[in-house]
Amino acid sequence: MLDILYFMFNNEESVRFNHLKREIGLTATTLSRRLEELNNQGLVDREVFAEVPARVEYKLSEKGRTLGPILESVFSWVERVNS
């Protein structure tokens, strides 16, 4: 789930499901489950638009944004350790 949160933190705008799927490389089922968990935890906001076909966008909630500095530290550490 850290990969989803980190990607969303680095993208200020709302992100559509398929964009996330392409960028992060998860299966649709896995991504759907993780987004649902993040939404239930209040870390990600989900907005459904009344359009055909249906459009759903995700973005970090205010609560999720507070994780930004922590995520940056974790991913910086991972880069240092793996280099």
Where are these regions (language model features)?
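Amphipathic alpha-helical dimerization/coiled-coil segments
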Residues: Y6, N11, V48, P69-S83
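Canonical helix-turn-helix DNA-binding module
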Residues: F17-F49, P53
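Long, contiguous secondary-structure blocks with strong helical propensity
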Residues: D3-Y6, L31, D45, V56-S61
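Basic, amphipathic "hinge/linker" alpha-helix immediately C-terminal to the N-terminal HTH DNA-binding motif
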Residues: E51-E72
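N-terminal helix-turn-helix DNA-binding core of bacterial DNA-binding proteins
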Residues: M1-T27
